[in-house]
């Protein structure tokens, strides 16, 4: 199914019901026309990071179901799957074969060798400091071979996630076979997880290394195109990187919108939001929440450093059951630039403020992605957080089918479902159309979307001082109650 301009639900295979069958039933029964696509977070056998340390992309974790269940989902919704282009599990057959056979392994070039990467007498501390890291030490891991020798491999993320060498032909063959298999099983859009880390080059920070990163991106796009799929690079960094990618006619993420929207709702000032909406490309997926924390680094220079600090402080002040320690190493937080909270709790579990945040997202340029906890206006799950000591689990509640049936009766959830059903069905949100943004006063923003020929005009007038709104289409008032 081609990508369509309808809201994409982000979910794990076992977060809305116990498995893929229940997920399929629950989306159909409770979300209806509010959902047009599904980002199915990693459902492959994995040894860590909630699926992001995959063992084998050709299998579905049996706890979730099988490929028939995945294909069944794809009959009703366009689908996005994750491809961890930077790494694979050290429990994979590729790693084990390399460990057993060393230089005789067919996969010896699949992994990026840390020792061979550096010239003699390097890396120096200066070299290590230059690397854009996700940990406070050199991103390497020891590998002990069956022949008794010891070497080191690049290891950017968790201990289970061993980096691939994307410059080698064996790796490109692996990428090709993986993408072909994903597309054959219903994948329409391939999310390239942690894409900016994939290329490493001497005397750089090893993050979004140009021009090599463009060569890799184009190669992967060409591979996907053969199977009729498209790609979405996932990169958390300065917004100008997203704009560069958009200029090359790729889909991009809007990871800045979450913090810009929080700042606007906390401060009752719309100037930063208005400027951002005017700048944003149409060929993008918008987010307020994902399976990770709320990104801070993405909003630099859209908000000033003072405004970022203000927003972070307000989140901890007005947020419900939010604590700074939940985003620290004590709770296994890899990324100091993310805040762990559901978006609903970041707004103090306030129904009206939360609905306005989603209204802004619905009218923003691009296609909305809504995380499953966000669709159900979910609160911070402190029980799961404390039982696992995993900070991101505060926003990873497991909903039973019975819980979902109860949650969708809440007025705020009903309103959200009506909002995104409207967004999916209205012609005004044409990605080839236009957006106009006005700010009648400091606290009021008027966002107007119209289709290419101007026959459908939707307008949202939002006042962040008194937290009111009015939505019209072709001058007819639209209600979401």
Curated annotation (Swiss-Prot):
Its EC number is 2.4.1.7. Sucrose binds at residues 49, 87, 191-193, 234, 291-292, 335-338, 392. Keywords: Cytoplasm, Dental caries, Glycosyltransferase, Transferase. SMART domains: Aamy (SM00642). It is an enzyme of class 2 (transferase). Its main location: cytoplasm. The active site is at residues 193, 234. One of its GO terms (biological process) is carbohydrate metabolic process. The keyword Protein biosynthesis does not apply. Signal peptide: none annotated. It is found in: Cytoplasm. GO terms for cellular component: cytoplasm. Gene3D superfamilies: Glycosidases, Oligo-1,6-glucosidase, Domain 2. Pfam families: Alpha-amylase (PF00128). It catalyses: sucrose + phosphate = D-fructose + alpha-D-glucose 1-phosphate. GO terms for molecular function: sucrose phosphorylase activity. Belongs to the glycosyl hydrolase 13 family. Sucrose phosphorylase subfamily. Some earlier publications concluded that the product of the reaction of GtfA with sucrose was a glucan, because of its insolubility in ethanol. Intracellular catabolism of sucrose. Being intracellular, probably not involved in synthesis of extracellular polysaccharides. NCBIfam families: sucrose_gtfA. This is Sucrose phosphorylase. It comes from Streptococcus mutans serotype c (strain ATCC 700610 / UA159). The lineage of its organism: Bacteria, Bacillati, Bacillota, Bacilli, Lactobacillales. The gene is gtfA.
């Amino acid at each position: 199914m081609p990508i369509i301009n309808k809201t994409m639900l982000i979910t794990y295979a076992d977060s809305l019901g116990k498995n893929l069958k229940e997920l399929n039933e629950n989306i159909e029964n409770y979300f209806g026309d509010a959902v047009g696509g599904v980002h199915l977070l990693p459902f492959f056998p994995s040894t860590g990071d909630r699926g992001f340390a995959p063992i084998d992309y050709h299998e579905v974790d049996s706890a979730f179901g099988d490929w028939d269940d995945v294909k069944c989902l794809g009959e009703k919704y366009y689908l996005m799957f994750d491809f961890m282009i930077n790494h694979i599990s050290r429990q994979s057959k590729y790693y084990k074969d390399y460990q057993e056979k060393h230089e005789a392994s067919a996969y010896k070039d699949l992994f990026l060798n840390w020792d061979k990467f550096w010239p003699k007498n390097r890396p120096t501390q200066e070299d290590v400091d230059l690397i854009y890291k996700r940990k406070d030490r050199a991103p390497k891991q020891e590998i002990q071979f069956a022949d008794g020798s010891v070497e080191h491999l690049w290891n950017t993320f968790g201990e289970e996630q061993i980096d691939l060498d994307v410059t080698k032909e064996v790796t490109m063959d692996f990428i090709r076979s993986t993408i072909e298999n994903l597309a054959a099983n219903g994948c329409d859009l391939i999310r390239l997880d942690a894409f900016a880390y994939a290329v490493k080059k001497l005397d750089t920070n090893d993050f979004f290394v140009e021009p090599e990163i463009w060569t890799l991106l184009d190669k992967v796009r060409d591979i996907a195109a053969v199977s009729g799929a498209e790609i979405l690079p996932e990169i958390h960094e300065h917004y100008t990187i997203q704009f560069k990618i958009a200029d090359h006619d790729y889909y991009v993420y809007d990871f800045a919108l979450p913090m810009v929207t929080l700042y606007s709702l906390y401060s009752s000032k719309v100037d930063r939001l208005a400027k951002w909406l005017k700048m944003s490309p149409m060929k993008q997926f918008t987010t307020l929440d994902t399976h990770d924390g709320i990104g801070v680094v993405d909003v630099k220079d859209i908000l000033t450093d003072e405004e970022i600090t203000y927003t972070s402080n307000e989140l901890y002040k007005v947020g419900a059951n939010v604590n700074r320690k939940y985003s620290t190493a004590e709770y296994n937080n890899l990324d100091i630039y993310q805040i762990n909270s559901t978006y609903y709790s970041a707004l103090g579990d306030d129904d009206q403020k939360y609905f306005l945040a989603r209204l802004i997202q619905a009218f923003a340029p691009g296609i909305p992605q809504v995380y499953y906890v966000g669709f159900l206006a979910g609160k911070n799950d402190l029980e799961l957080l404390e039982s696992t000591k995993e900070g991101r689990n505060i926003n990873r509640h497991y909903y039973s089918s019975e819980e979902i049936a109860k949650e969708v009766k809440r007025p705020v959830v009903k309103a959200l479902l009506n909002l995104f059903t409207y967004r999916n069905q209205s012609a005004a949100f044409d990605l080839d159309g236009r957006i106009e943004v006005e700010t009648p006063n400091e606290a009021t923003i008027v966002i107007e979307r119209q289709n290419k020929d101007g026959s459908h005009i939707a307008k949202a007038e939002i006042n962040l001082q008194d937290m009111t709104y009015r939505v019209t289409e072709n001058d007819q008032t639209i209600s979401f109650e």
